[in-house]
Structure formats: structure tokens, C-alpha cells
């Protein structure tokens, strides 16, 4: 069989190039709903994260603005360029797995006291560095010591404003293991963009990052964050 190896260098990121499906959706005639989310808005703007210029296009208002999830009325998107669209072109490589993700996986393992050949803090920082390098973004060392926190979402049309989803910083928290896990997964979530399914799976698995509730909740307000476990598996471990 074949083997694939993702090393601890951004030039070993696994990707492939073809007609990028996100570009196909975003550029489809009459479809305007592919925009930045409010949660990404809060984290990238609050952290003043320089990757936002790589991930998203400026809105017509000259800022990076997202929208709360769950709007029923599609008219909120129409006739207004005040929202940021994905900065993804037809030939933008589609990422499968990155060196940054590997570092964050190791950081989480180290936090659980597994032998990951590094401390949680060192691996967390290496994950951020790898993400910056992957996207050709500079000033990562300044970012790593930043005490900035996620921003309040100011709202957009019928998309209501909301307090900041979290109070974590980029600079490593030395006091709380819980906060450290939140930092690791939040930065992993940012670095995974635009892999929405993987990012959603991280939230379901860990509860992080802290995200905004959707505007119209059709599930009764209950979102399961647990991984389904079969009855047979449970009985085998009783």
C-alpha cells in the first residue's frame, strides 16, 4: 500500500489542486450566502490576526465582517457587499492536512501528558508558526505574545450583535489547563480554515472554540458534542 507522511514543516502540507469547490460555490450566479461567519469575525478581528487578509476579502466597507449562522431569510445577503467573501480562487490548492494541524494534535496530546516530544506550549507555538508560514504571513513572533482577546460581534442588518465568544488570548496561559486546551483547539480551528467539516468535528469533540449560537435554532437548542459510542462498545468496557 501507499504511505503519506506530514512532517513538521509547512512545505510538507498535503494538498492538491483542481477546480476548488469553495470557489465554485462562492462564484455561482445568484448564490451569495458563502461569507465569513460571525465567530471567525470575532476571533480574527479581536486578535488582529494577519491571516484574515489571506482567508477573506475586504468588504465594501473596508473591513472584515461576518454573519451569524442560521438566518432563514436569504435577502440578508442580497444587494449588499458589506460582508467578507472567502479569498479563494479557482486554482487555490485544496488542503488535506497540514504541518500546523500535526503540531496542534501533538500539543493536545502533550497536555494529556502523552510523549509528544515537546511541551504543550512549545508545540502550540510551533502550530501557529507553521500556519503563518503556510500562508506567507509575517510577524508571527509578535502575534505569539499578543494579549488581545476576541472581539464583540457588532451585528449586520438582521444579524444581531453579541458579546465576545471567549476571553482567551494568543499568548500562552500558564495557569489553567482548561484554558490551554481552549487555546490549542481555537488556534487549530483558525489554522484549519477553510476545512469546515474538520473544524466542526473539532468543536463537537472538544467543545472548542466557543462559538455563537445560531440565529434560528431548529434543534431545540441542543447540540451534542459527544462522539457516538455503540452499545456493544459500552458493554465491552463495563
Q: Can you say where each PLM-predicted feature lies in the sequence?
A:
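Hydrophobic-face positions in mid-chain alpha helices that act as interaction patches
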Residues: 2-3, 7-106, 111-112, 117-175, ...
Amino acid at each position: 500500500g501507499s504511505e503519506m507522511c506530514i512532517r513538521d514543516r509547512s512545505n510538507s502540507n498535503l494538498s492538491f489542486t483542481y477546480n476548488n469547490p469553495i470557489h465554485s460555490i462562492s462564484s455561482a450566479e445568484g448564490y451569495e450566502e458563502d461569507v465569513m461567519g460571525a465567530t471567525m469575525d470575532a476571533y480574527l478581528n479581536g486578535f488582529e490576526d494577519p491571516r484574515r487578509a489571506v482567508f477573506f476579502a475586504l468588504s465594501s466597507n473596508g473591513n472584515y465582517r461576518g454573519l451569524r449562522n442560521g438566518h432563514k431569510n436569504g435577502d440578508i445577503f442580497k444587494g449588499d457587499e458589506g460582508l467578507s467573501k472567502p479569498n479563494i480562487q479557482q486554482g487555490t490548492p485544496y488542503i488535506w492536512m497540514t504541518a500546523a494541524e500535526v503540531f496542534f494534535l501533538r500539543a493536545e496530546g502533550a497536555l494529556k501528558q502523552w510523549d509528544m516530544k515537546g511541551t504543550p506550549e512549545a508545540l502550540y507555538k510551533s502550530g501557529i508558526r507553521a500556519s503563518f508560514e503556510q500562508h506567507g504571513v509575517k510577524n508571527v513572533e509578535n502575534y505569539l505574545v499578543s494579549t488581545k482577546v476576541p472581539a464583540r460581534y457588532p451585528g449586520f442588518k438582521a444579524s444581531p450583535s453579541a458579546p465576545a465568544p471567549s476571553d482567551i488570548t494568543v499568548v500562552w496561559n500558564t495557569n489553567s489547563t482548561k484554558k490551554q486546551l481552549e487555546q490549542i483547539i481555537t488556534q487549530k480551528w483558525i489554522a484549519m480554515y477553510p476545512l469546515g467539516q474538520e473544524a466542526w468535528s473539532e468543536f463537537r469533540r472538544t467543545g472548542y472554540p466557543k462559538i455563537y449560537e445560531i440565529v434560528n435554532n431548529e434543534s431545540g437548542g441542543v447540540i451534542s458534542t459527544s462522539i457516538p459510542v455503540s452499545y456493544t462498545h459500552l458493554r465491552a468496557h463495563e
